Each structure stands twice: as C-alpha cells, then as structure tokens.
C-alpha cells in the first residue's frame, strides 16, 4: 500500500508553539510526518549562530508525538533540496508532499525547494498554521556576557 508522507523543514531554534501547529497540520495531511531540522552550518548562514545545538533540536523534534522521523539536513546552503532528494531515494514508493508554514507562500522566488519539488513531482502545500511566533523573537531575548556557549569556533 502506498503511504502518504508529509515533509516539513525548519531551524526550530528554538522550537515554539507555532512549529507544533505546523507539524500537526502537516501530519493531518498524511500517514507519516518527516521533519528536516536545518543543521548548524545552515544556522550560521542564516543568523550567524545557533541558539540550541543541532543534536538537541533534532532530539526534541523527534520526541514529539506527531513526528515519525526527524532528519538532520545534509545541505550546505540555506535550502533542504539535497535532503529532499535523499528522502525521495529512501522512500521511492511513498507519495511525498512538502509542506510550508503559514509564513511561507509557494513561489519559485522565495522557496528554495520549489524547483526540486517540481523535478521530483512532489506537491507543495503552503500556509499551514498561523505565524504565531518567530524563533528569533526568543533567541534575541538572551544576552551573553561571554560568547555563546554553543559556538564551536
């Protein structure tokens, strides 16, 4: 039997209630939910640092009830294109869908994964959940006298 698998991605740095809504709405569309967690290198590209180390973010996401698999992104840029390709190879018989949160609209100019999803015939769903919070809202509240404890430089 062909399984429908929803794929979501993000930094989840830190995870907040908006992410939980995004995960649940995505899971409601499928039999299985795979969450791609952006890696440390991607955090550095996006915001210069990470609030939580990647392994902690991955473990927290994996232990959520609605999440079936959590995968650390293998990409070296801000996209998760190569990780989506890897999932497609791992699950060739599954019907995959790529879901975006409420703050992202499907547009080839603002979603890095647009072209790879077209190429692999993976439908995209957008607007899942309201923009309740921004992770940067939380991480910006903490000031350090010392360098960030999670900085591995």
Model-derived features with residue positions:
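Nucleotidyltransferase catalytic core that binds NTPs
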Residues: 1-153
